[in-house]
Amino acid sequence: LTGIDPDRLEEEKRRGLTIDLGFAWCTLPSGSEIGFVDVPGHERFVRTMLSGVGPVRLVLFVVAADEGWKPQSEEHLAIVDVLGVQGGAVALTKRDLVDADRARSSERTVRERLAGTTLADAPIVACSSATGEGIDDLMAAIDAMVSVAPAPAEGDRPRQFVDRVFSIAGAGTVVTGTLTGGRLTAGEEVELFPGGDRARIRSLQTHKRRIETARPVSRVAANLTGVGRSRIERGDVLGRPGDWWPTDVIEARIRPVRGLTHPLSPRGAFTFHAGAAERSAKIRLYDAASISEDGAFVRIRLSSPLVLDVHDRFVLRESGRRETVAGGVVLDPSPPQRPGATAVDRLERRERAGREDIPALLLAERGAVRETELRSLTGFDEIPGAERVSGWWISERVRSIATSAAIELLTAHHDANPASEGSDVAEVRRAVADALRRAGSRADGGLAASIVDDLVQGGTIARYGSFLRLPSHRAEVAPGELDRLTAAVAAGEPTPPSVSELQRGGFARETIESAVRSGALVRIAPDLVLTPAFVERAVGIVRDAKGAGITVGDVRARLGTSRKYAVPLMEHLDRTGATRRSGDLRFARGT
């Protein structure tokens, strides 16, 4: 078909047996170019076969006419079936080694085996690579298969499944694999998942031709700078930075493969195969004690993280029996830590949903989603109809819970403390986070802070320094308390008690704040207040110095105070414009 021998290894050539993945390509009669991933057929290399077949959409299934259907043929068909390939053709090879009756018998057997699978209607073409018989017919069948196959999805979230990595002297690290989901361009920055290493694409090739942009679905070789070969392995994913969220726990529906001869129990030891990756896996059933032919919802814990997307298909093999036992579809690549009693209902909704519905479902499940999470979990940047708040997408329910919690806390605080300006910002944020947690929604501290800030910006609550209050609230100081406070400060001047000392003396913080707001006291520093009359005395002293100016030390001496008060007092006058500073001297405004 291609004129290319995909067997690279010396052992493969010596034994006439495919051991590792091989690659070839050709131009079809229609002019379309197609790439092949040659996967091992021997039963000992099924794991390698899975790493190559995972990302592909179309299958050329090979059965030798002289050897007939084999156990590995059955397992390969089961794998192809559960992966849901979008088209296929069957090559009945070695036609030259059998007579016509044997060829017809082999074809009937193959057709019977394909019944009820995704390849049930695939054309079967008898052919021989030795004589050339049927090769043109096989090429035409492949061309027809490609022409009717659905166009590959092309979004803006590329994902290249790495199935080979090597180094070239003078060029650096090269990764090859099947590209899906979006385009990659030479020169752009990329990330290798799940490890997180960043690199830059030096150059791209497909079918040994240099290209500037690679499109899905195609075989791509990416020459990378900034990352060494030892940092990459088969099963990794090459994508754009931040586009993917590696996971070691997923929720899915799995179904036993056709013809499984024993019950499928979650208690076995399994290997999980998706894309080009393989992981050990543990399975937990949600809605049944065993897995029936109709399948079951499951939670799968992987031995280490990998990159998975909603609707990705995967294969499960039972380690002890060394056989493929099930296939599945990823429904949630990043499920809640605690599934809860509604897990089945949630997964049923996800199973019915299209890809475009996933962002809204994610928001409904979590109540709030970070913008960065939305991109890496769904591939979308927006949630139609949802509200965006400081880097978060939030649901109406979360907005309502948070607003009610803030208003209830402030109302109770104002009722209990009428003289108080308000409640501490941190206290309101904690109340919002606690309310979200009790309601089963996300209770991230950053989310609570963002919502509280948004409530302030929207006018639902008001801010005064480090305090929050309802817009209608006005602090009410007990009659006579303000006069008693100002008298205490005046009596202590020129070295009055600090704010901390006043509070220890029985004056409420709210009373002191009220005095400052009303102008009964002047705050010259966070812990120092003075009477307006004392401040005006200082201004008069500076004014008396006229054009000669006056030092802080002279002001301190004339006031009879200490540097503890004189320095912040003069800095306060500078800030308010009553004085100006030139070197060590102060001058009254206008002099």
Show which residues each predicted segment covers.
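Conserved Switch II/interswitch segment of TRAFAC-class P-loop GTPases
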Residues: 32-34, 39-44, 53-105
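P-loop NTPase switch module centered on the Walker A-proximal segment
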Residues: 1-47, 56-63
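Residue-level signature of catalytic and energy-coupling elements of molecular machines
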Residues: 1, 16, 38, 49, ...
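Alpha-helical scaffold elements adjacent to nucleotide-binding pockets in ATP/GTP-utilizing enzyme cores
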Residues: 48, 72-79, 105-113, 137-145
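Conserved nucleotide-binding/hydrolysis micro-motifs of P-loop NTPases
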Residues: 42-43, 65-70, 85, 94-99, ...
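C-terminal effector modules of nucleic-acid-centric enzymes and ribosome-associated factors
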Residues: 97-103, 109-112, 124, 227-523, ...
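Conserved catalytic-core segments of large NTP-driven translation/proteostasis enzymes
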Residues: 95, 101, 112-260
